[in-house]
Amino acid sequence: MNYELRQACDYCTTDWSGGRTTQLYIYPEDGDYATRNFAVRISSATVETEESVFTPLPGVQRELMILEGTMTICHEGGSPKSMKPFCDVDSFSGDRETKSRGKVRDFNLMTQNGACGTLVFVET
């Protein structure tokens, strides 16, 4: 098995409408989030506004876990869900309009094009 040790300066951080996002991993390696050309993307983002609207991502399955802060998230046609750090994972389709309330730092898994995955918090 091959592995690669990366440092903070190796990651790309960009702005989105509610804060900043740092891409930690993308597959395939030459994938591109901006053009939605990827099968798997892992990122960590900050939500820096009290209320935000998530970026629409048609065809992308999303898994979200809060790392810091608390958030209430609501998807189009659904009920609001309160989320606390390392307690809750929210799985949702990027096709649905998603709004949130609360300033947080989160961890995201995005999959599409036949890829799948799940976020699970393992307490040691």
How would you label these PLM feature ranges?
Residues R36-E50:
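Short, positively charged
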Residues Y3-R6, S43-T46, V120-E123:
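Short amphipathic
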Residues Y27, A45-V47, L57-G59, E68, ...:
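Acidic/polar N-terminal loop/beta-strand segments that form early-domain functional surfaces
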Residues G102-T118:
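A short hydrophobic beta-strand segment most commonly corresponding to one strand
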Residues Q23-Y25, R41-S43, L64-M65, T72:
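Short, conserved beta-strand segments within well-ordered enzyme catalytic domains
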Residues Y27, E48, M110-G114:
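Solvent-exposed residues in well-ordered beta-strands and their adjoining turns
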